[in-house]
Amino acid sequence: MNEPRGQLRAAQPADTAGYGPHDWVRTWTIAMDALARASVAAAAATAGERLRAQTADALAGPFADWAFVDLGDGPPRRAVAARRPDPRLATVLTAVGWAECPLITSALQHRAPLLASPVEGDSLLGRLPDGRAVIDVLGAHSAAVAPLVSDGAARGAITIVRCADSPGVGFVDLGVLSQIADLTCAAVARLGGR
């Protein structure tokens, strides 16, 4: 392709090929809105439980169909929020520990954010107590995890999941999720384990 000299052309990641300018604006707007909402949650939190719940709520909506925030010393505690709330399913999902979710445990072991788009392997996000795969129950097609690492130790993770009618999680989303994890870690340090 012949490009006029002196003009730069923005590269597009493979998972967003075919996006038009309006799609890029929408993607960035949604991501920045999620970052702003999570920043408010991190700044306003007065206890770990509130931080988990408010962060999950900040991410659910246009940024994620489902958001899980696993955080806590000792047994991890999970907050769950959804774009289209399903209180019964959310309650069941709080019982799925991060140790049962290969995508989350891998992110924690490597201390690095991970992206699964498309998700492969039905147990990637764990199984419900009745044996059904979380991925199947949610209808998930992509997910991303950012570990919560403070003082070199894994304190938890933030996971976002996108389902049927949502675009796949991409690298822009993963970068924003990593920033949100950093803000959440700063809030955890500020709260001092409360």
Where are these regions (language model features)?
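GAF sensory/regulatory domain recognition
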Residues: 3-9, 57, 68-99
